[in-house]
């Protein structure tokens, strides 16, 4: 951006995840003349992966909408302008004319830093991403049927080093699970941490990944600095086994969309591209068997087979549990409140959020992640 007018703040097309290069502005949620607050939903954007509301990173008066609804724009393209009343229309016109997309070198550096990499472990070939930073690293662990792209809204918010990986049976990693499936995934995490010479880390886990993060911390207390668990397995008795079965067996767009919609309180987040990507993943050799094996290891007649509550209560490190009140996969139940008996454990129950708080409550989750040092 070449303009030096600091009284003008641009609203740009956000970048979510490694592969996003453009997005469609579906709808403006604010009007010219509105005073925008930080965190306020200002527009709805759709990519080839997901549709989501965009929250304002800056506060100010919306003076101009540059982008039109229904149009496709490059990442970092100028969509709107915030400026106070003292800024003239002529200054805004000049700013818009001079604005330069910041995709360029800065964006290339980010993409380079977060490009997919691969490492050979005893459990197979593992895909991961890494970004340098200052402080204790954050290690992100996805859930059942997911991959590291589930963290597309969260990987770049912390100034700390960041790692995220595709577990065996998922994403672009090896599909075979050797031996006990949960132990195979646990071993993968342990070997990855060792291979990357990570002496300590903040563990961030979602669903099955929350169970794995907690298990790692329990078994390696000297390596874990904190736990951030999103809709985690392993803390309650119930699990939606019907979802696990249907996800494992879905082989059509209709079946997959119906199933995946259960993940979200706002089902409009599920778009055609998301469904197509999941079906492509499901059709890879070894995936169906891996999911079936994991499903059987985690659940039995709608009951979870692993419960780590007592061990977490005895663990001496900060634990934040974030749960969607509308979670239909691992529903929040009163028994979770037993966790709060430990003074080191904080529980955040979010209204109007389903099983994917990292996508449905981005601001809240990222606020927690930014506090990790």
What are these regions (language model features)?
Residues 1-115:
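Mobile cofactor-carrier "swinging-arm" domains
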Residues 130-172:
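Conserved HGGG/HGGXW glycine-rich cap/lid loop of the alpha/beta-hydrolase fold
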Residues 163-208, 212, 367:
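Active-site loop/oxyanion-hole signature of alpha/beta-hydrolase fold enzymes
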Residues 214, 218, 224-256:
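Flexible "cap/lid" loop of the alpha/beta hydrolase fold
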Residues 253-313:
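Conserved alpha/beta-hydrolase catalytic His-Asp/Glu region
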Residues 302, 326-330:
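Acidic catalytic loop of the alpha/beta-hydrolase fold
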Residues 308, 331-339:
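Short alpha-helix in the alpha/beta-hydrolase fold that links the catalytic acid
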Residues 315, 321-323, 327:
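Short beta-strand/loop motif that positions the catalytic acidic residue
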């Amino acid at each position: 951006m070449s303009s030096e007018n600091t009284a003008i703040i641009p609203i740009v097309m956000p970048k979510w995840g490694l592969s996003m290069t453009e997005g469609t502005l579906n709808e403006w949620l604010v009007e010219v003349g509105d005073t925008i607050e930080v965190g306020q939903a200002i527009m709805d954007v759709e990519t080839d992966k997901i549709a989501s509301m965009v929250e304002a990173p800056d506060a100010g008066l919306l003076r101009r909408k540059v982008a039109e609804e229904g149009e496709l724009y490059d990442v970092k393209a100028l969509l709107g302008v915030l400026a106070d009343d003292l800024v003239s229309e002529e200054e805004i016109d000049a700013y818009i004319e001079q604005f330069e997309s910041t995709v360029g070198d800065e964006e290339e550096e980010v993409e380079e830093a977060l490009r997919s990499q691969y490492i050979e472990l005893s459990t197979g070939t593992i895909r991961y991403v890494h970004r340098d930073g200052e402080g204790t690293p954050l290690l992100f662990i996805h859930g059942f049927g997911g991959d590291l792209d589930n963290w597309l809204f969260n990987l770049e918010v912390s100034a700390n080093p960041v790692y995220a990986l595709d577990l065996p049976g998922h994403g672009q990693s090896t599909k075979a699970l050797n031996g006990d499936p949960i132990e195979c995934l646990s071993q993968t995490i342990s070997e990855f941490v060792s291979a990357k010479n990570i002496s300590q880390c903040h563990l961030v886990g979602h669903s099955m990944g929350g169970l794995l993060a907690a298990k790692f911390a329990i078994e390696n207390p000297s390596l874990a600095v904190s736990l951030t668990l999103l809709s985690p397995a392993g803390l309650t008795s119930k699990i939606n086994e019907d979802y696990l079965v249907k996800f494992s067996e879905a082989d059509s767009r209709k079946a997959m969309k119906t199933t995946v919609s259960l993940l979200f309180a706002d089902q409009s987040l599920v778009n055609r591209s998301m469904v197509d990507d999941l079906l492509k993943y499901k059709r890879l050799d070894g995936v169906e068997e891996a999911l079936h094996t994991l499903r059987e290891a985690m659940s039995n007649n709608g009951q979870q087979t692993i419960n780590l509550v007592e061990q977490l209560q005895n663990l001496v490190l900060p634990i934040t549990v974030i749960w969607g009140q509308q979670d239909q996969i691992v529903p929040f139940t009163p028994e979770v409140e037993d966790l709060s008996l430990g003074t080191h454990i904080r529980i955040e129950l979010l209204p109007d959020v389903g099983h994917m708080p990292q996508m449905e409550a981005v601001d809240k989750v990222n606020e927690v992640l930014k506090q990790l040092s």
